[in-house]
Amino acid sequence: MKIEKIKLPIYHGTLIVIKTKKMSKVAAKYDLKNCDDCDAITFVRSNKKGIKKYFVAFENAKPSIIAHETVHVVNYIYQHHCIELDRFNDEPQAYLTGFIFDEIYKSLNKKNGNKQQ
């Protein structure tokens, strides 16, 4: 299991990207239920000061799965900051989605020995 921590600007907190060969190891480490058959999972923990850690764990890191988990991360961030999604002014959401996707993608590819931008 490989883990990378990425600081989140503006919204604070940390994005934690996990690449694993067996999701059951992630489930055991973080006491997660019902994720042994998952290709990926997103979950949140808070430290003692209430700062959020957004975890994204991947057994299968296809772009469509990264995109799927990115939606969960963005929604968690919006929920924790009491921000309502706005279909008519979605630029902040679009920028955050792009940022989260790029950070996950770079992290997962770096762990595979590739340096992709």
Feature map (PLM): residue ranges:
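A general marker of short, structured functional hotspots
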Residues: 7, 26, 39, 50-51, ...
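Short, flexible coil/linker elements and helix-boundary hinge sites characteristic
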Residues: 31, 59, 80-82, 109, ...
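Membrane-embedded glycan transfer/ligation machinery
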Residues: 64
